[in-house]
Structure formats: structure tokens, C-alpha cells
């Protein structure tokens, strides 16, 4: 959209806003309160902790909707693109909801899943369109997360999306530890990885997913630490690595597929979406899967290096046709 000369406004807060500002310093970022979900230290507490915060999430959805109605009086946006935020739709704009999780997995059984899907679809159908960054065919990434038995009538599969580009660079024979996600699980995984990596005869680069300021850098002879990388720098770092160890975040999966990079996936404990996605990718023969509670880094690295996993080719340009069909010139 920027390349087509459109005026873009972003909205967010905290770490999200800081990352957007670093990537797009010339774009205005409006403060918009996030859902501010807190996460437990123990994975088995994840579902009850989230369930207890449902009233807070519903309140946040209502608040963001009224925030948008107020901002529309002064900005009058033509198009609103909502990244998984259910309240950001407006009748005077083309409102687009983006998500790969149309039918959330509760971890509480099929009845709970059906109820969540029903509620999710009711919200999504208030938008003009629902864009799913995946393919519609059987050879898809997200499985039943976005190919459920019931889907919104405004859904459009726009193909996987990634800003990464394949690089013609030499493999520098290091393993990339790519940390991300909410605390405290980000730090828990970091500590587990560093403890085991320090005893393995390999060279590691650890991108911690943290802002550089006020952060202490751990010490290790075979591990290089980087607090944060912009997308272009991260693109090059992934391209130069021999394999990546990371969470099963959907954006990360799309990036790795586009770059054709081997990876060990470690789902965030308790996050049913990541657990499902990691299991699915392993069963399809695409990636190596490790469970955080039973992490065996040495075994996982050997499996990943020795694997003959083949990810089929995906078209990462489908979304461009979808944007063109909207008349964005």
C-alpha cells in the first residue's frame, strides 16, 4: 500500500508500537490500548488464566470499537485493517479482519471449540472481509484453525504472507535461536536453551526479542547475543544460519517456509494453537518438533540436520491480487 502511494496510519501500544516505529519510522502511530493479557508461568495454568480474563477481553473489544468511532471523525479512513482485533470495524470504511485463527482451539473439548468458533464468526462477519494468510486447498498451513467445518461467509484465503526474501548467501554454520512471545515463557525458554546450548559443540546466535536498552547480556563462549533485529537484518541472519530454533508462531512459520529454512519448533506451553500447529507441521513432514518441558536440544538438532523434510512450494504473491481487486492503486 505504501508503494502505491496510500497514506497509512498505524495503531498500537507498548512493544508492538515500538517494533512498528522501528520498522516504519515515517508512519504515524496512534496509541491504542491492547488487550493486556497476562500469562502464567506454568503451562497447565494457561487455559484457566485466559478464561478468567475473558471479561477483560470483551471489555477491550468494546473499548477499541468506540475508540475507532471517535477517531473516524477526524481521520475518515477509507480502509481499516484489523490484525486479530474484533472491535476495529466501521460502517463508513471497508473493514478487513486478518487472522489465521477463525476457529480457536480451547483445549477444553469440541463443545467449547464450537462455542468459541460461533462467537468468533459472529464478530468476524461484522467486517466487510476476513483475510486468512493461507491457501484454501488441502495443502495448507493452518489446518482446522482456519479450515473448520463452519467458516465466515466473508472469508478470503490470500495465501501466506512474509516480508522475508530468499538471499544468495553462504551458510555460516551457526544455529539461530529465535526468541519471541509473551513473558514469562520467553525467558523460561531462553534459560533452557542457553543452559543446553552452552554444553553443545555448535556455534549459536541468540536473537532475544528484546529492546536493547536496559537489558543485561548473558555470557557464553559459544553463543552470540543480539537483543533485537529489524526485519531486514533478521532476514539475512536466518538466511545465513544452518537451522533455526523458534516458537511455533504463525508469522515465524510463514517466514521460514518462504526462506526454505530447516527449523526446530517449540510451542509455547499452554498455547493450544501453537501446540496444534507444531504437531501438524511435524506430521506433514515439514519441521522438527520439541516440547519445552522435555527439551533435548542435542537430539533435536541431530534430528533436524539429518531430516529429509520437504516443504511444498507456496505462492507468496496471492495477496497482491486481492489488494488489486479492492481497487487500491
Locations of the language-model features?
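Nucleotide-sugar donor-binding patch of glycosyltransferase catalytic domains
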Residues: 225-228, 258-307
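C-terminal amphipathic helix plus adjacent low-complexity
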Residues: 298-329
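Conserved nucleotide-sugar phosphate-binding/catalytic loop shared by glycosyltransferases and other
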Residues: 4-54, 224-225
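Conserved nucleotide-sugar donor-binding subdomain of glycosyltransferases
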Residues: 45-87
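Donor-nucleotide binding loops and adjacent catalytic segments primarily
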Residues: 145-147, 156-243, 253, 294
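Active-site-proximal region of nucleotide-activated glycan assembly enzymes
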Residues: 91-157
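Short, polar loop motifs at secondary-structure junctions
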Residues: 13-18, 80-87, 162-163, 207-215
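A donor-sugar binding/catalytic signature common to diverse glycosyltransferases
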Residues: 233-276
